[in-house]
């Protein structure tokens, strides 16, 4: 069946919200299929010039052409979705370095894309003077209650206040002061 491998690529992404391993084998197999379909299309068109207006040959050529386009659309959708997930990872994690477990699942081009995207985002953040990845949603409350999960001792917050963050203590602090501590797992937001 034509386009079977390409459709499997799309199904592979649907099965998870994370970024699966880059499926180089299926991409290459789909491209090889596209080349073979193109050669069959050219062969059908050139060998049957006198019969090219007959419905059978027209439908034959249209089938090859549509299969090539479907393969191409599936590959582009696969790659686009992976890039969207890479961008989403950068925004949600706030990290400018890829962890090894994620890096091994990406192709070289995707790793390069992440680096370039990170440079653009970091440069933009520095020009604006804000880290836009910290809170993509506006906060509902200015102060939040947090519990200390990792012993930090005395900490000076962004606002200039000093607070003693001892293990298992709870505090009512300004959200903007402790967002990074919540993100890195030192504090836990108590709801």
From Swiss-Prot:
The keyword Electron transport does not apply. It comes from the Eukaryota. GO terms for biological process: DNA replication; DNA strand elongation involved in mitotic DNA replication. Its main location: nucleus. GO terms for cellular component: GINS complex. Keywords: DNA replication, Nucleus. InterPro entries: GINS_A (IPR021151), GINS_bundle-like_dom_sf (IPR036224), GINS_Psf1 (IPR005339), PSF1_C (IPR056783). It is found in: Nucleus. The keyword Nucleus applies. CDD domains: GINS_A_psf1, GINS_B_Psf1. The GINS complex plays an essential role in the initiation of DNA replication. Component of the GINS complex which is a heterotetramer of gins1, gins2, gins3 and gins4. Belongs to the GINS1/PSF1 family. This is Probable DNA replication complex GINS protein PSF1.
């Amino acid at each position: 069946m034509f386009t079977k491998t390409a459709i499997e690529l799309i199904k592979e992404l649907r099965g998870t919200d994370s970024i699966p391993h880059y499926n180089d084998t299926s991409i290459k197999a789909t491209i090889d299929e596209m080349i073979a379909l193109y050669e069959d299309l050219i062969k059908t068109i050139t060998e049957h010039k006198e019969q090219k207006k007959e419905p059978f040959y027209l439908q034959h050529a249209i089938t090859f052409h549509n299969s090539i386009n479907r393969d191409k659309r599936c590959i582009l959708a696969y790659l686009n979705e992976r890039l969207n997930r890479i961008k989403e990872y950068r925004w949600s994690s706030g990290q400018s370095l890829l962890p090894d477990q994620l890096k091994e699942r990406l192709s070289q081009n995707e790793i390069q894309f992440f680096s370039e995207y990170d440079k653009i985002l970091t440069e933009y953040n520095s020009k604006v003077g804000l880290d836009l990845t910290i809170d993509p949603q506006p906060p509902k409350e200015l102060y939040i209650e947090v519990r200390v999960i990792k012993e930090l001792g005395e900490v000076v917050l962004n606002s200039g206040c000093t607070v003693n963050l001892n293990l298992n203590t709870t505090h009512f602090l300004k959200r903007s002061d402790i967002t990074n501590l919540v993100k890195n797992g030192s504090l836990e937001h108590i709801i």
